[in-house]
Amino acid sequence: MNKALKIKRGLCSIVCSLSVVVPSAFASMERPHYVGTDEPFAEKAVYFVVTDRFVDGDPSNNYEDQGGEYPTFNRPVLSESGKAVANIGYMGGDFAGIVKNAGYIAEMGFSAVWGTPIIDNPDQAFSGGLAIGEGFPTDKFKTGYHGYWGVNFYKLDEHLPSEGLQFAEFTSALDEYGLDFVLDIVGNHGSPSFDMPRDQPKFGEIYGADGNRIADHLNRSPDEISAAEAESGFFHNFPDIGQLSNFNENSPIVVEYLLNSYLYWLDQGADAIRIDTIKHVPNHFWKTITDGIRASYPDMFFFAEHWSHDAEAIAQHTKPENGGISVLDFPGQKAMQSVFGLDDQPMSDLLAYLHLEDGIYENPYELMTFYDNHDMSRMNAKDAGFINAHNWLFTSRGIPVVYYGSETGFRRGQGEHAGNRDYYGQDKVDWGVNHPIRRALIDIAQVRKRSVALQRGVQINDTFSTDTASFIRAYQDESVSELALVMLNKSAEARSVSLTVPHSCNYKEALTGREMTIERGGWSQRLEPNSVAVWLCSSPFAL
């Protein structure tokens, strides 16, 4: 992770390579540099799919008869009235469904797909654990449709590939659409491993690359594992998350197994890595893993899930001594749901999570920004709330992540076992092509895709009020200059938005193509309801 570069309005902090010079001198003197990050992955915007719940592109890999007395396909969760409110079985989504809709994803301005883990999971529903509810974890009769219950980290789950579309072919197919693939990895746990009425095949077991079993929890509670066995084996003898097996990260056997499995998939075309439940494993483990991967892939980008709204807690992972791993910006997620959801809190509430200058994060410009995901309730907002959230997400600092279906407001407000992870399907994709949320998302995401200032530039906040916000994104190195004036209005009425312009230039508004000379100093523009304006200047500048 690259160290953040700081800037303050009216002066250069450490981003400037020399004292500020007047624009006319740029031809003969080195111009000041303004770089939020030089991380290549910062160019990306990420579309996140629970692969099984996106689109069924190949019904032949559904295995609808799998599981025997604990079937795995289509297991609805029923309310007290008998209505299906969610599903905890496989629903058919696969690699073919993603490839079939790769153009749909790319059109929205995304350049990467993050899919849930691809590794083999058990072939039955889990018979232990607590009954399904909104608490965590409640896993009784749930299946591994989500991919996080790995039993063989070197084998694809059979529900994902198709003939001629194994993982290497899948990543190559995405490449043709300009889409990277983010590999979701787990280092904390395997599958549910105890509390079953009787032992079930694969649960609590680990298999090697050759298909042979190398570890088995034997349906024992962790405290039944001896200290000697825990020290030399695969599993700790204390629980962590529900009934999931708790990997012994201090064991060289575990480290070697996991590291080599991650490299196995990277060798087949995965482009970046998302780390699940990072806070459940000590930092030294992830330093070993990231060092091991970067020995072969020195530019590999990692980001991790540490579910906490405390910036200092999640920032630890971004430090070089802990692996230099970016994180999903959970403090930002909480703020965005509050501001753009039905609570409709003021835009000024967004400022606190940015941490542009206080040094909490190694580099705040490399954080993954999002407003909801598969583990929490989807954002409960009107269409305008989603539009405004995307306008902010794709112009402010960080790398945007959007959860599948959000482009149509899919299952808004619903939690994990209340519809959050429902099957989307080809019919919904086709129906939503011209949805107003999606059309507005395309507009602003394509602007970011073309703008180095929005991708990598420093952010200088100007005016944030109840319904409006204005700020500057600035990027300049020895060969490229781009200054972006960003203005947002989340009100249902037109609003005048003010901004202090740092540089006189002939600006071009990125969404409309309108051109205007804007002089340095105070300036305001009247914005339509629920809208954004991004004025771009490509001449050299000094702030």
State what each model feature region is:
Residues K3-I14:
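Bacterial N-terminal signal peptides that target proteins for export
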Residues S13-P23:
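Bacterial N-terminal signal peptides
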Residues A25-A27:
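Boundary at the C-terminal end of the N-terminal hydrophobic targeting segment
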Residues M29-E30, T171-A173, G178, H189, ...:
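Active-site-proximal helices and loops of the catalytic beta/alpha 8
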Residues P32, D38-K44, D52-Q268, T288-Y297, ...:
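Substrate-binding/active-site clefts of carbohydrate-active enzymes
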Residues A45, I518-L543:
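C-terminal beta-strand-rich structural cap/linker in extracellular carbohydrate-active enzymes
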Residues V49, I105, G115, F153, ...:
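Conserved, mostly hydrophobic/aromatic
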Residues S111, D271, P400:
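Short acidic/polar active-site loop segments enriched in Thr and Asp
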